[in-house]
Structure formats: C-alpha cells, structure tokens
Amino acid sequence: MAQHDFVPAWLNFSTPQSAKSSTATFDKHGEHLSRGEGRFGISRRRHNSSDGFFNNGPLRTTGDSWHQPSLFRHDSVDSGVSKGAYAGTTGNLSGWHGSSRGHDGMSQRAGGSTGNHRHWNGSFHSRKGCAFQEKTPTEIREEKKEDKVEKLQFEEEDFPSLNPEAGKQNQPCRPIGTPSGVWENPPSAKQPSKMLVIKKISKEDPAAAFSAAFTSGSHHANGNKVSTMVPSVYKNLVPKPAPPPSKPNAWKANRMEHKPGSLSSSREAALTNPVSVTKPVVLAAGVVLNAPKESPSSTTPPIEISSSRLTKLTRRTTDRKSEFLKTLKDERNEDCSQSRDCDKLEGLRLEGSHTPEPKENGEQGCLQNGLSLPMVEEREVLSHSLEAEHRLLKAMGWQEYPENDESCLPLTEDELKEFHTRTEQLRRNGFVKNGFLQGRSSSLFSPWRSTCIAECEDSDTETSSSETSDDDAWK
C-alpha cells in the first residue's frame, strides 16, 4: 500500500495522541527550536537530516529551571524508537530508558552534546555533563537486559515536548511486532484477509490465484467467486476431463504447425468436434500455450475454458454462416457455369468460321489454338459441367494443340451456314429434339438441360463478352 511505503512506524498507531504528535512535530519544528519553556525535554526533537545540527554548548537555563540539552535524533525510516536519558529538576530519572532501541544498531547522535551518550552495546561514555547522568552501572545492566527483551517494541508517545505530562509518568509500552513485519504486513484490517484469500485460491487452482492477484482489496468477493465458479463451468464445458499431455513438447509442435490434422486428442476433447478446424485451431493453440506455464497438471485451466467456450460459440455461428455461404457459392457457381457453358457452346459454334472442322459425323471438330487454351485453363477453375464439355469435345476428335495436325482443314461457306442453322434449331427446340448431338451428348447435357435452355433463350447471341466477364469475376 502506498501509504505505508516511507512512513515511520509510529504513524500506524491509531491513538489521537500519536496523530497529534506526528502532525504537530513537523508543524512546530522551528518554533520549538527557538523557544525555551519551563518544561522537561522541550527541545528534544526528531531531526531527519544528517547535517549534525546539535547543541554543543553548556546546559541552558531559562529562569531557574533545568532543561534537557537539545538532543536531536537522526534515524532512518525503520530504525525503531531511539531515546536518550534526561533528568528532571530534582535529578530523578523519568520513565524513559536511556538506550537506543533500534534494531539496526543505530546509536544516539550526540556529537559533543552535554548529555550522556550511550551506544547500543551498552558501553558508557561520560562527555561534558557527567553530573547530568545519575545512573549506576547496575541500573544500566538491568536496562540492557530489558532492552534485549523489548528490543523491537515501540513506545507509543515519542514526543514528550508535545505532551508535558509524559515526562512525569511511565507510558505503557505497546508491542506491535518486528519492524520488518510491520513493513511487509502493515496492521490494517484488509491485508491479512487478502493474503489469506490468495493462499486459499492458490491451493485450489493456481491459475485462479494468478487472476486473483490482480484484484484489489475491495474485490475479495470476486476472488472467491472465481474459485467457486470454476468447477461448475468446468463441468458444463468439459463433460469428460481429457488426459493431461504427456510431454510439453506436444504444445510446441502444435504451435509450430497449425494443421487441422495436428490436433492432439486432449484438445479435441476440450474443443468439441471442430467442423471447420483451421480457424479455431489457431485460437486454441494460443490459448493452450498459456496453460502449461501456469498449471501443467490441470487438464484445462479456467483461462482456457473461457476462451474455448468463446471459440465454440463463434465456431457454431461461423459454421452456419460458412455452410450458407458455401451453398450459395455453389449455386451461383453452377448457375454461372451452366450459363457460361451455353454461351460457350454457342460462341464456339458461331466463331467456328476461324476453326477447321473435319467431317466426322457432321459434328464440330477442331478448334483454333487461341480458343482452346483459355478453355483448358478455365477447365481447372470451373465446375464439372465444363469438364464434361471438354470430354465431349475430345471424344468428338478435338485436340488441345491442333496446329500440328495435318488433317485440320479450313471451313467452307456451306459448312458455316449449316452450323448457324443447327445452332438456331438448338436454341429453339432444345439440345436433343432434332437429333443434333443426340447420341453422345444427350447423356452428358441432360442434368442441366432445363435450366440452360431458359438461360440460352434469354441471352440471344451474347457470346464472348459475357463469358470473359464471368471468367474474370470467378478467377
């Protein structure tokens, strides 16, 4: 928590005295330096910088009362509470122990101060004001024993200058644990419960603890909800838990190749029956790859469960959509190919003046190379009806590269007229009625004859332009 970062430990006390002392200390710092009142320890003060600002002169007297020498203390953030000895007017010791209680061996900064200077190990040095020290060595040893017991405990009131009665009576000590414990677990109501929640979740499911670590202290209910929701979601989504992968290399192999066949059995159990596998595999691979880092033992962690659920939902919708689009595309493909076949038959026969025709059964023969080559290329792209036409032309004696064939002869005017009349009859009567192309072609053209007749009657003699535009659109 931010408020515990670099704040002294005495700010954690909830009593109003300490709050008053913490605020008033910093407010009245300079004021107390210049002012000498007739109270004990009035100039005793925290001094948080290391500029050696000490009172090295003799004992001050204001009126006829003693004052404690201005003993400033420089301490680090967690050095504990370090107190010096001071005496009252009668010379009796007050309840303040004269030893430093810091856990890091922080001794009192008394660089030439008139009071007694005492190191943390109990060695005793008399400086200028030896008369000011009235302790016997036995008392010092007793205090040393006490300090070993109470070494890391804090006095609640650290500033007797702000509370004049504090010097005349012993203040009860209030232990709050070691300073390291204070910094790691500050004494607030939220912190222990938060640590406890995370510990519980991490025993049940490490992935849930990973997600709960990001929730703030006010969202503990959410953290518990995650841990309680996980089993029900797990049962709903994965009815039969898949066996964990034997090697972690299986995940890496699946990441390297996103092929539909490379699905492992456990992932197929988690992702139910993928129909169009290629899209969800990439998502699932990304999802599953996060899983072994967090919990390789659990079959499907909750992160994967949620995203696999998403992929399942999206896959159902995309299946419906893709099936609809696929059927629509097939229907359009068949319609376009059928109309294209009709146009192509007419175009081939109308432009037959440029192509030689051998007199086999009076049917159409060789084509020119310029017409045959695009037809061969389109045959790979277009549907089965065009392949049927291609097979028909081959059976009638057509060759793919007929320029090397010596039997190809140019068409005459009579043959061209006969070709036009036959195509007109085909358009009016249908493909089969007058006996033209009856024997071989009737079985091949029969599946799409009815639709093709209507389309051919609608489009009179638009031949090459429509077919090329259709081809460009579908290539």
Curated annotation (Swiss-Prot):
It is found in: Nucleus. InterPro entries: Vasculin_fam. One of its GO terms (molecular function) is DNA binding. The modification Phosphoserine is found at residues 49, 76, 202, 383. Residues 294-311 have a biased composition (Low complexity). Residues 92-115, 160-191, 237-271, 292-318, 456-475 are annotated as: Disordered. Pfam families: Vasculin. GO terms for biological process: DNA-templated transcription; positive regulation of DNA-templated transcription; regulation of DNA-templated transcription. The modification Phosphothreonine is found at residue 300. One of its GO terms (cellular component) is nucleus. It comes from the Eukaryota. Signal peptide: none annotated. Keywords: DNA-binding, Nucleus, Phosphoprotein, Transcription, Transcription regulation. The keyword Magnesium does not apply. Belongs to the vasculin family. PANTHER family: VASCULIN, VASCULIN-LIKE PROTEIN 1. Possible transcription factor. This is Vasculin-like protein 1. It comes from Rattus norvegicus (Rat).
